[in-house]
Amino acid sequence: IAVYGPGQLPMKEDQTPEPEDPYGIAKYAVELDLEAARRMFGLNFIVFRPHNVYGENQNIGDRYRNVVGIFMNNVMQGQPMPVFGDGLQTRAFTHIDDVAPHIVDCVANQAARNTVFNVGSESPRTVLDVAQAVAAAFGVEPQITHLPARNEVVHAFSSSARSEAVFGKRKTISLEEGVRRMAAWAKRHGPRKTCLL
């Protein structure tokens, strides 16, 4: 959902994207390229804008992406969880099992062609909620280090109404359940070294 920037909530696919960082700009550039290829060459496309996806088999050693994995890796190493600002910024954290079925089903679905879809949770949660869920999944008290706030969108979540209209409504995994599943996987595999770039 990085393409949206700080727009109206919930973010909807028909809003004009206003990405604020290189990550969001790059994602939007790919969408524009796909649309141009459709117009010029007849290439069909399907774009998914997933919401803060986390889950088993994720690279938890990447210190720049995915707060759930970062928190788990730190907890397993006895380090505090780094929270930027007050931790009250919200995101719609979405377990991978809530995203993957849409991707699998889209190819055979004619109604999905040449369309952009938001996919993910419609229940925004704070970063502090994530810290609490991770600590609970590991059976520890949350230890948090507050870092200076970053220049980022404070609240980000989007509507999945278009996705539900095309793919149907699906049961979603709660943050707590998803974190428990990922924590069970992480405990089996252990912490990962973090690249210090």
Q: What function would you assign to each model-found segment?
A:
Residues I1-V3, I46, V53-G55, V67, ...:
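Conserved sequence/active-site signature of Rossmann-fold short-chain dehydrogenase/reductase
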Residues A2-P6, N52-Q58, L88, A108, ...:
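Active-site proximal helix/loop that lines the substrate pocket
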Residues A2-V47, N59, R63:
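Catalytic helix-loop patch of NAD(P)-dependent Rossmann-fold dehydrogenases
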Residues D14-E18, F45-N59, I70-T94, N118:
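A conserved pocket-lining segment of Rossmann-fold NAD(P)-dependent short-chain dehydrogenase/reductase
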Residues Y28-E35, R39, G69-M72, A100-P101, ...:
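Conserved active-site helix of classical SDR/Rossmann-fold NAD(P)-dependent CH-OH oxidoreductases
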Residues V75-L197:
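C-terminal substrate-binding subdomain of Rossmann-fold SDR/epimerase-dehydratase oxidoreductases
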